Amino acid sequence: FGIATYYGGEIEYRGQDISGWRADQLVNHGIAYVPQVDNVFPSLSVLENLQMGGNSLPKQILNERIERSLEMFPDLRNREYDLAASLSGGERQMLAISRALISDPKFLLLDEPTAALSPLYQQQIIQSIDSLRDRGITILIVEQNARLSLARSDRGYIISNGKVVHTGDAQHILTDPEIGEYFLG
């Protein structure tokens, strides 16, 4: 996504090496990313931010996708003409996820989607993740709150010092006393 410099290695998606691809190539292949850092356009309205997520789409399709994303986050519907700068941190995170969904991704990467959010907004984000999973979207959650991400995952990967130190069934990771005590506290 152009956020970090690509130095080597391989990233494979659906049997294809996507290492070093540009953001537009990733989006065109159904991959969307929501970073941990605030990445909305503060001087644009909520609606304009959503439109930026699909500015190459035909207007009717774009409007349908915006409508679907506003249904997922009703708080945004009530603020669609407000500037993004006026939104709370939780609302900005909902907007960032909504904008990523405009591209109709098949694979969604969420980096710390609930970090520094109030419990109310955390719950709304979690509900949206569950809804997206139920729609068949593959979601990779990078999250320090392992219990939050593992509770809604099929598989879990525990990384320590930059290396995968455990992988397996998410429920097994959550319930195995040795793994849980060591990694989940």
Feature annotation, model-predicted:
Residues 1-185:
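Glycine-rich phosphate-binding loops of nucleotide-dependent enzymes
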